[in-house]
Design a protein with these regions (language model features):
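Beta/alpha (TIM)-barrel catalytic core signal, keyed to glycine-rich beta->alpha loops juxtaposed to Asp/Glu
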Residues: 24, 28-204, 209, 221-226
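Active-site groove signature of glycoside hydrolases
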Residues: 8-25
């Protein structure tokens, strides 16, 4: 409750449109957490509630306490299996899925071909998907995506985002970037029209489970998708 009050003060607003529990607390029942967040809605401080890095069972339990408007989980062509498990649950409950890292932390843009493409100190160097054989496997996957992107006359990033958007209107990806030119590039994905055959080829190029390596280091993985 105090955290919400502090956020309202920092933002200089009276109400927050969407308030997330950004990581599920393994030591606190989700019913207790959402129960407290529900009171924020009742007090008029928050309009809607969201979860992040929550597994389907947790989402369902939370939704029984108060309607969940959005779930922010990782979902991309590099990380499909759990993303699609989440999507099944959110669709059952009428919840919007907000995929973060839809470009696989740049892996799916075709700009990462080896460790040398990441600057010294980049935290991605600690992520297993950017290491050793897993990196080689993922680079090979991206090359298949790049081939289709060339045929569609777009960048790999645009193709990947267009594929994600084509999965349904209840999906709102949030790609992150530090550069305006990347924002402009990503927005162009809205103009790309993919045929059923295109979608099939893209899906086959990066089927569920094809991405190698975990999303985070082992210790961090213990605190996500709970």
């Amino acid at each position: 409750m105090q955290a919400c009050d502090a956020s309202l003060k920092r933002l200089g607003i009276d109400v927050i449109d969407l308030y997330y529990q950004h990581r599920v607390d393994a030591n606190t029942p989700i019913e207790d957490t959402v129960g407290a967040m529900k009171r924020l809605v009742e007090q008029g401080k928050v309009r809607a509630l969201g979860l992040s890095e929550a597994r389907p069972e947790t989402i369902r339990r939370a939704h029984k306490v108060h309607p969940i408007a959005a779930v922010q989980n990782e979902y991309s062509l590099l990380y499909r299996k759990e993303g699609e498990e989440t999507l099944k649950a959110t669709r059952e409950l009428g919840i919007t899925l907000v995929p973060y890292a839809p470009l696989g932390r740049s892996m799916l843009t075709g700009t990462v071909h080896g460790k040398g493409d990441l600057p010294e100190g980049d935290r991605r160097l600690q992520h297993p998907r950017f290491q050793g054989d897993a990196l080689d496997t993922n680079v090979a996957l991206v090359k298949r995506i790049e081939e289709i992107a060339r045929e569609k006359r777009c960048t790999p990033a645009q193709l990947v985002l267009a594929w994600l958007l084509a999965q349904g209107k209840d999906i709102v990806p949030i790609p992150g970037t530090k550069r305006k030119q990347r924002i402009d590039e990503n927005l162009e994905a809205l103009k790309i029209k993919l045929t059923p055959e295109d979608l099939k080829r893209i899906s086959e190029a990066a089927p569920p489970g094809a991405g190698a390596g975990t999303r985070y280091p082992a210790e961090t993985m213990k605190r996500v998708y709970l």
